[in-house]
Amino acid sequence: MRSVTRDQKPTVRVAATGDLHCREDQHGRFRNFVKHVNEVADVLLLCGDLTDRGTPEEAKTLAEDLAALRIPCVAVFGNHDYEAGAIKQVCAELAKATVHVLDGDHYVYEKTLGVAGTKGFAGGFGRATLQAFGEGTTKAFVQEGVNESLKLEAALGQLETPKKVVMLHYSPIVDTCVGEVPEIIPFLGTSRLSHPIDHYGAAVVFHGHCHFGSREGKTPGGVRVLNVAMPLLAKTTPDQRFALVEV
């Protein structure tokens, strides 16, 4: 049993991963993963692309394994989860395994840790961030990134917990995209997501999406950012396909 002094807040062991890309026929694929998480973590965060094609059948297969979790599970969706246009059905299947899906809102663990989550979106980084100028389609693309940033801002603004973490699918910084083909980096995230993070603060940010990116970076304000895409973790820490952080 972990002991704390009167003035300390209990440490929460957060396991985080993303980009599971579960397919309909992959029954039992995540059974050992769930067993491992149960042994070492207090809460599990799934950072998008839970399914490969966004079908309810894929979500049902994943939920079969996640149902064995003995700890809370919180998720955001990724771009793959929207592919089939069945996001409500996907959400319903995951709810059967008590997965809490965030979309611009938050989850609170034992009044100590607040989790703010949204999918995020693309748009580029720093001085190369795409601006809302020109064609209507360009403006709509930029506005989607702005909307996701505002959703994250709202989620963080609602939290009054002593500790906060952020979960996204898309990256809020360019550093964790390094290693990807340079031409696709503007589609892996946007700096707009980092603005509410630096304004409200967080202990750590988790994201996925960047299968060939880098493991870690920081926002301009110094908040730690971890890329927890499972394909990347499979290469760097094959025996533990999730990040484990004490907050």
List the model feature ranges, each with a label.
Residues 16-18, 44-49, 73-79, 100-105, ...:
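Active-site neighborhood of phospho(di)ester-bond hydrolases with catalytic His/Asp-centered motifs
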Residues 62-66, 171-200:
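Cap/insert and terminal regions of metallo-dependent hydrolase folds
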Residues 41, 70, 98, 161-162, ...:
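Short, well-ordered alpha-helix to beta-strand connector turns
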Residues 1-71, 82-85, 138, 142-143, ...:
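N-terminal active-site segment of His-dependent metallophosphoesterases
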